[in-house]
Amino acid sequence: SKCDAAGPTHTRIGDDKSGIHGGAYYIPDDKYNEFMELYHRDVISKNKLEYLTEKQIMTDSSPIAVDLDLHFALDIENRVYSQEHIDDLVDIYLAELSEMFQFSESTAFPVFIFEKEKINRVPDKNMTKDGLHMIIGIQMGHDAQCILRNRVKDKVAECWGDFPLTNSW
């Protein structure tokens, strides 16, 4: 549905070439799971182009959200990163978090990795797109998340530096 008084939860970036119109939308909590199932069915599983972004909640704190968008030349036909790269990414974040927080030996929290089933070749834009999302189950304010991102950015770029990226970190 269109935005209500709570403001948009999602925005859609328009792309005239693809016939995708921009907009802002409000998905209520009680419809979110249904929305995600429909989105997966109609967009992700059919590998359709879509430019929908979820607005990050700007409360005092929220789980740590990491979004890695990887762009390559169109001739890249297979996923470039491996499970080892993902493990290194998680290790880099955990090392930085241990510098920012005091954890006891028994501290445990979830780390979720989300990735598409396959890369997305976009001939119209002469590129191949890939990427992943990571959610770390620690509550952290938005400003602190920005600090964390700045602290890990160069380390991730160094670790994944052999990738033939066409975009920057």
Predicted regions and their residues:
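Signature for HUH/AEP ssDNA processing cores
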Residues: S1-L132, I136-P164
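Structured partner-binding subdomains within large eukaryotic complex subunits
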Residues: L165-W169
